[in-house]
Amino acid sequence: MSVTISEAVKYIGVDDKTIDLFESQYVVPHGVSYNSYLILDEKVALMDTVDTRGVEQWEKNLLAALDGRKVDYLIVSHLEPDHAGSIGRLVELFPEVTLVGNAKTFQMLPQFFDELPVDENHKITVAEGESLSLGTHTLNFYMAPMVHWPEVMVTYESSEKILFSADGFGKFGALDYEDPEGWACEARRYYFNIVGKYGAPVQALLKKAAGLDIQTICPLHGPVLKENLGYYIGLYDTWSSYKPENQGVLVAYASIHGNTAKAAQKFAEMLRAKGVEKVSVMDLSRDDMAEVVEDAFRYDRMVLAAASYDGGVFPCMQDFLHHLQSKAYQNRTVGIIENGTWGPTAGRTMKGILETMKDITIVDPMVTIRSTMKESDLPAMEALADVIANA
């Protein structure tokens, strides 16, 4: 896909439409882009490479944009293989290229390329706030550790006011896919599942970015952002501070034979009847786990409904709670509905996991259903729905 940035700054990335799982776990039905950029000046700088899955098309894009010139510098923003995977091919094409990274970059580089033929004279180690002149363009480097790896750095090109933001502001989806839900949907799913654990480092990076005059954001996944940048930065501020983006309730259920599912659907109806405008109901056995995690962070309230299983909770609920725990889920109100036949254990298991998370308010009553939802269960469900609707 053709992407216009400026006369001197060229997009040379690739779309991957054949990948089924990003990082071997996140479904990407509309593919993903691996973004790479070229800055043409007195010196030529390449901003990251791409996954080896796209190396052939990337090489064609690179050579076409160079039009006979050579790459002087490779800026290594992030060493993850979907961005650094083609460094070896670049060095084959341009043996005299100089790699630019930080101390952590060069510490980690041999773990991925143990025989990369780049000597110390072809490495530049940069630190916070240092710069590299290409001629009329100047690259300014800012460290972004744990956004979302320790070696990550972003680059601000001051003449055209471009922020090369590494994985920040990235999203799922090939560049030629027009998402009917807009940028935020797949950017949110990407953020909370890839970067979500690292809210404090993202906040630190946003503070650095606030001091820069940014007119364009060039991420390593997803579209180049040029307009209404305050909208995107505002969302990142909300997400990284773990504030709910919207008022609403996620009802996530784990059902073995369909009885807990019926209770969850009934509970969702109760919430809607009480005026809750946004209620998202997710089946943890079948729905995309990354999307459920996304909704958990998006809304201010959550209700978990699960069957008891092997003295604990049905595994897909345990898996979901593990995802929330690992992504630093916090600052939310949660209700619990458990189901069990001879010894309900789901409720206390879910409660125990939730209690390990920061600032989670678990509300009463906890509803216990015995095997199937009955008329006698409805008053307790209504009581919980009242609490959740008014929380």
Language-model features and meaning:
Residues M47-T49, V71-L79, L99-N102, L163-D167, ...:
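Active-site neighborhood of phospho(di)ester-bond hydrolases with catalytic His/Asp-centered motifs
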Residues E42, R53-V100:
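Active-site metal-binding motif and surrounding structural segment of the metallo-beta-lactamase
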Residues V3-E7, G101-V152, Y198-A204:
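Metallo-beta-lactamase
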Residues S86, D288-V292:
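Short acidic active-site motifs
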